[in-house]
Swiss-Prot record:
GO molecular function terms listed in the Swiss-Prot or TrEMBL record: DNA binding; nuclease activity
Role description: Necessary for recognition and cleavage of the phage packaging site (pac), together with the pacB protein. Both are probably the two major subunits of the phage PACase.
Compositionally biased spans, kind Acidic residues: 374-387
Stretch list, region Disordered: 42-62, 304-325, 356-397
Keywords: DNA-binding, Hydrolase, Nuclease
Keyword flag DNA damage: no
Subunit structure: Multimer of two distinct subunits.
Name the UniProt record assigns to this protein: Terminase A protein
Length: 397
């Protein structure tokens, strides 16, 4: 529909039904400001001098009273066309009104969260009834405004939860307050949803005031923030408690190790144990060997005592004798000489193989004698290394 059609429809509805521009814009799903701009001037033009709307259009006076029977057929056709046009306009207006109503209904159904709130309300109500059971299995009735004071039943529910989890006195007190606050906050949330639901049912359908849905959303956002804060508080308390418990276990374990080490030293003095035996006793009882005892064990293992009766050859306590040192030195020298002999023999074999296969001996690879090269004198800056030659080829070569 064009704005001309809207002007005609608005003029008819304003004349017959007393429609306002706002109502017309809502009926036809129009922008109120745009409708007001287009229809206001037309509305002012349609008013009469005495501000009364004529029920029927004013007909112009006939210029002549001459009856022209030749135009009767034309006049009848004109009246029929006007009636058909009026019916067509009425059908268009009715269809537009129905379409606008359907669109408004779809918009209201889409924006209305009555079903969501009902499901949430029912779930929270069931949870509230489930959480309001005391230790004896008795159910108490929740009254509006209970969340404003200290809820005893919430404290009882919190104590029951803490007894199942296990905690000390301080942690129990802190968690009890946090959990009771959390339960009371959930009760307040459930009550607010119920009250806003009742208020929405009682509220009339008008354009003024904040919709209840926005109030519910604001309340749920606040409750979510508070619940998250309480959950973080409870989580921090539990972590601190676990950390303190681990520290206490470590302290007890260290104190137990100190007792085991002390008992090992006492047994060492009483039974004349060695340091190694005392360390074995500590490890057998789950303790940790002290660093000083470990150093003593390492020193004893590096320098064991000798079982010789010769006091002249005996050095300081725990040190090897001079004969042992001389024997060890001779064995190592013989081992080095044997290794050197093996190395020289191996090198001789490698050089002989190179000379024989590479043609560097008396005869080259092609069978030609190398005497000319062997008899060649050394350069001025070259000297024959007789020691190396003697080691490689012997004195006879």
């Amino acid at each position: 529909m064009t704005w001309d059609d809207h002007k005609k429809n608005f003029a008819r509805l304003a004349r017959d039904g007393g429609y306002t521009i706002a109502q017309y814009a809502a009926e036809f799903n129009l922008n109120p400001n745009t409708a007001r701009r287009y229809l206001r001037a037309f509305k002012e033009d349609t008013r009469t001098t005495d501000s009364r709307k004529p029920n029927k259009p004013v007909r112009k006076p006939l210029k002549s009273m001459i009856i022209d029977h030749s135009n009767d057929q034309h006049a009848g056709d004109h009246i029929a066309a006007e009636i058909a046009e009026k019916e067509r306009v009425n059908a268009v207006v009715s269809a537009a009104v129905e379409n606008a109503k359907r669109q408004n209904k779809r918009i209201n159904d889409r924006s209305d969260d009555h079903d969501v709130i009902t499901r949430a309300h029912r779930t929270l109500r069931d949870r509230l009834e489930r959480d309001t059971l005391d230790d004896d299995g008795e159910r108490f009735e929740f009254e509006v405004g209970d969340y404003l004071i200290d809820n005893v039943e919430a404290r009882k529910a919190a104590r029951a939860m803490l007894r199942r989890s296990g905690a000390d006195v301080l942690e129990t007190t802190l968690l009890e307050k946090s959990l009771s606050h959390l339960l009371m906050l959930e009760n307040a949330r459930d009550t607010c949803i119920r009250l806003v639901q009742e208020m929405r049912d009682q509220q009339k359908d008008d354009d003024e005031g904040t919709p209840p849905e926005y109030r519910i959303a604001s309340m749920l956002n606040s409750c979510s923030a508070q619940i998250s804060s309480l959950i973080n508080t409870i989580y921090s308390i539990r972590n601190n408690y676990r950390k303190e418990s681990r520290e206490a276990e470590k302290h007890a374990l260290s104190m137990g190790q100190a007792g085991i080490v002390k008992l090992a030293y006492e047994r060492k003095r009483e039974n004349n144990w060695s340091v190694l035996e005392a360390a074995e006793f500590i490890e057998a009882h789950g303790g940790k060997v002290p660093p000083l005892m470990l150093e003593q064990i390492k020193a004893d293992l590096r320098a064991p005592k000798t079982n010789t009766d010769d006091e002249e050859n005996q050095t300081a306590s725990g040190a090897p004798s001079l004969e042992d040192l001389d024997k060890i030195a001779r064995e190592r020298a013989a081992s080095r000489r044997a290794d050197a002999a093996l190395w020289i023999e191996h090198r001789r074999e490698e050089i002989a193989d190179i000379v024989d296969t590479g043609g560097y001996g008396d005869v080259d690879a092609e069978g030609i004698s190398n005497e000319a090269w062997l008899e060649q004198d050394l350069d001025e800056d070259e000297e024959e290394d007789e020691e190396v030659t003697r080691k490689l080829y012997g004195d006879d070569d």
